[in-house]
Amino acid sequence: MSTWNLLLKHEDLGEESKRRIKATLNKTISLKELELAVADGWVEKKRRKRTVTVEKSKALGDSFEDEVWTAFYRMGFDYMNSTNKFELSYSSSNPALTKQIDVIAMDDETCLFVECKETDKLDRTKQWKTDLEAMYGHYKGICDEITSKFGRKKFKYIFATRNYAIGQTDLDRIRDFNFAFFDEDSVKYYDGLATHLGTAAKYQLLGSLFAGKEIKGLDMNVPAIEGKMGGLTYYSFSIEPSKLLKVAYVLHRNNANHDLMPTYQRLIQKPRLKAIQEFVNQGGYFPNSLIISIDSGGHQLQFDKANTQVEDSVSRVGVLHLPRRYQSAYIIDGQHRLYGYSGSRFESTNCIPVVAFVDLNKEAQLNCSWI
């Protein structure tokens, strides 16, 4: 049977996050237990009158798993596993058949499963055919199990490793199974991103995992003004931050790379982001528009002109149908203002002004960013 009691809401995972974020295991025991604890690998850290605090290194694999779990926790997913004993049934006919899940992270639209593998020394020979094929065989079943309890979602299985050099055959197998692969650099990248951006990092992760995929049920139709400027067509509109966050991105590359963190830190400055988040949560607002470039996906954007127009005006009013795809809106200017709404109580009730161009090339994007 699935161990649903070990799948908790984000607000109920505070104590687990404190344990996972520590580099070592710690506990307080009585003095009479100290000798046995030392024999078991624990090291005395602080002695008191009747008790003593001891610590020891986490077991191989646990530290990496905790690092991955903590990164996803910082991103603010709605549900996560509270321990590594969480299991999901993969057989509707025999619920007793289960698969242990190292990390599960879920929100209202997506569900991510992560399997973590770590070794203490670099291993260039390990083959993962059996492990990957076993997961692929269980994958539909565990997705169906989640769907039966939480409804339809977008799923992604992530195979995360540390100190393993994955061969091309296994990388091809991961791609063919529509899985994702994170090496230690990818994990460091997303952990750093979560530390830097907080809950806003989730949208960059999901955008990378599901780039170009439709977000079903997302209403992206907005009242808009169509205008002309510099030989380009643009649209001016207002939209809820919660909607734009789901389709927006700030870096063109999809591959997670720890070397990209300085670029993120330049584009989105943590002190400024924090200040804007506090300003927004206090009821503050920004009247100036975000500037974005919409990726049309090779299709002309639908703009339904209103029946009533102003005569002799270049502008037109109507309803703009924005793409409902991950990574379909590149943020040229206004990153802090947008991501400042992430996790805010106003992210679904406020509207922010936007000026949107369509399929701008990089040179044109640079021209917009410094104006």
Enumerate the language-model features and the residues they cover.
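Short, glycine/acidic-rich beta->alpha junctions
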Residues: F64, P95-A96, I268, R272, ...
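Short glycine/proline-rich turn/loop motifs
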Residues: K49-R50, V250-L260, S315-P323
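Intrinsically disordered, low-complexity Ser/Thr/Pro/Gly-rich regulatory segments
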Residues: M1-K216
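Basic- and aromatic-enriched surface patches that contact anionic nucleotides/nucleic acids
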Residues: P287-G298, D304-I371
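Glycine/proline-rich, flexible active-site/cofactor-binding loop segments
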Residues: L60, M80, H258-D312
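Active-site-proximal loop/hinge segments that shape catalytic or ion-binding/gating pockets
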Residues: I215-P262, R266, K270, G284, ...
